[in-house]
């Protein structure tokens, strides 16, 4: 193969890697991560997300859902670069409809809640705004529907609660409601969090 030949540029690298990268081949994943030019969003060209567009995040979260196939070093690199990518793009827009359709996407959003307060607040604002825009008053009912679920988990730190909620097909909706309701509760308790420029 031509895997040993260095590509001419980032776009060429993205198109070449996209066709031959296998999630099951740790060596290819490590090669992709090590040889990606810029540290940041460009790395995800390797993972069929060459624009770092938010609509393709479920493809990245699919990789995270199979992270046990990675070595520890590769997994940590993916986490670090993914976080840097989201911070660079200010999480642009989380696609609310993808939360309803893609289980790995929901898993990813739950994991994002563990990435520090800045990221958590950005995710919360984005989900809350779209929830209200799409569902209106129904969005406020979600906190009522999940209040019994949240009480036992309230003793856990928010990061632990989000980390535990890796959804399966039958409870994806449950964890999504928990994430949205938790976002509403936190937003209500803080009233107006400090705005960071």
Curated annotation (Swiss-Prot):
Broad class of the protein's primary localization: secreted
The keyword Lyase is annotated on this UniProt entry: no
One Pfam short name: Stanniocalcin
Disulfide bonds listed in the record: none
Protein localization: Secreted
The entry's keywords: Disulfide bond, Hormone, Secreted
One GO term of the biological process aspect: intracellular calcium ion homeostasis
Annotated GO CC locations: extracellular space
Coiled coil: none
Signal sequence extent: none
Keyword Metal-binding recorded: no
Region of interest (Disordered), ranges: 1-20
Family under the similarity heading: Belongs to the stanniocalcin family.
Function text: Has an anti-hypocalcemic action on calcium and phosphate homeostasis.
Protein name per its UniProtKB record: Stanniocalcin-2
Origin organism lineage: Eukaryota, Metazoa, Chordata, Craniata, Vertebrata
Gene for this chain: STC2
